[in-house]
Regions:
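GT-A fold catalytic core of metal-dependent nucleotide-sugar glycosyltransferases
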Residues: 123, 133-202
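A structural signal for well-ordered alpha-helical segments within the folded catalytic domains
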Residues: 87-90, 135, 139, 237-245
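Short, solvent-exposed loop/turn segments at secondary-structure junctions
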Residues: 61-65, 112-114, 161-163, 183-186, ...
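Short, surface-exposed beta-edge/turn micro-motifs
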Residues: 54, 103, 175, 191-192, ...
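Short, hydrophobic beta-strand segments that form beta-sheet elements in well-ordered domains
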Residues: 101-111, 153-160, 178-179, 296
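N-terminal anchoring/stem segment of glycosyltransferases
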Residues: 3-130, 146-150, 199-200
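Extracellular/periplasmic catalytic domains that process cell-envelope and extracellular macromolecules
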Residues: 47-52, 172, 187-189, 287-291
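Catalytic core and acceptor-binding pocket of nucleotide-sugar-dependent glycosyltransferases
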Residues: 203-310
Length: 315
């Protein structure tokens, strides 16, 4: 009986994310969302050329001290310091470098990549405050679209996101920015791990990411957020929450391939089932099944541990 009560309580907490989104959206709509002064990364020393191929933007930070992620809508807390992103980042970089459909890979990081020497990989060394980890990630995207590097169709992805470019026939569709949504109602609807941006609307994309940053700064001061998540969403959750507020629409219940406008950008909503698929740790998948997915997201600390089981897809 107690176990059932715990499960119901856990699900209730997760469903409350929709109430939080609604309350925050109303507070943002009613307030004058000021343009926060944002200090972007100076990327003038880097260059890029126009190409029919994709650019990929990644963000990676070395976390040294114990960093516990524990929010009420996360089933089990975990320590970022115990999650090995190095192996999955290395596999992803080597996989991307072999693709003839990739123009450049821009890696924003505070580490060195000495063992990879390839002109397609551009390492952008930056100082990263790990106490504001997800804020720093959002800042890199904002900096990129406001630099001379943003010249091509661009995939902003987490380091644990693998793109099957043979199946990613998406940039021919009508949109400016494509996002993926999850239908399971205990998760935040839009996942920030996959953001696809077309090059045709550069000025509008700048506005989109500027407001992304503005909302982030605003909600960090919100009592709604502090009551739900505590005092620090700079380190985790803040980026995803800000993105969901930016595209908040009809209660955030989205349809597959739905279109609507945000900041003059035509948004396309893609199903996570194909474009942000997360394998379940307890489920067995055939390689042919996984190879048909356009984008696979090895999300969660459990999946990092079993990633070696899926390596043969990419090598």
């Amino acid at each position: 009986m107690n176990n059932l009560l715990n499960i119901l309580t856990d699900h209730k907490k997760k469903y409350e994310i929709f109430e939080l989104l609604e309350n925050l959206y109303k507070s943002i709509s009613l307030s004058k969302l000021k343009n926060t002064k944002i200090k972007t990364h100076n990327l003038d020393s880097y260059s890029n050329l126009e190409s029919s191929n994709f650019d990929v933007v990644l963000f990676h930070s070395k976390v040294i001290k114990p960093t516990i992620i524990n929010y009420q809508d996360i089933t089990k807390s975990f320590d970022l310091n115990n999650v090995n992103y190095d192996e999955i980042l290395d596999a992803n970089l080597n996989y991307l470098l072999r693709s003839y459909k990739v123009n450049k890979i821009f890696l924003f990081s505070n580490i060195s990549i000495d063992k990879i020497n390839n002109e397609k990989l551009v390492l952008i060394k930056i100082d990263i405050n790990n106490d504001k980890l997800m804020y720093e990630r959002t800042l890199t995207m904002h900096s990129f679209v406001n630099s001379n590097l943003f010249k091509n169709n661009t995939c902003f992805i987490d380091t644990d996101v693998f793109i099957n470019f043979e199946e990613l026939n998406i940039f021919s569709k009508n949109f400016d920015i494509a996002l993926t949504h999850r239908t399971k109602q205990t998760f935040m609807p839009i996942n920030e791990g996959v953001i696809l941006v077309k090059k045709n609307g550069i000025s509008n994309a700048k506005e989109f990411f500027r407001n992304y940053m503005n909302i982030y700064s605003f909600i960090c001061r919100s009592n709604y957020v502090k009551n739900f998540y505590g005092n620090n969403i700079y380190i985790w959750r803040g980026g995803q929450l800000s993105l969901n507020l930016l595209v908040y629409n009809k209660g955030s219940i989205f349809k597959d391939y739905e279109n609507f406008y945000v900041d003059k950008n035509l948004i396309l909503i893609l199903p996570s089932f194909n474009y942000n698929f997360t394998p379940k740790a307890q489920t067995t998948y055939s390689l042919s099944y996984l190879r048909k997915k356009s984008i696979i997201h090895y999300k969660g600390h459990k999946l990092k541990k079993i990633f070696s089981n899926f390596k043969s897809i990419y090598f």
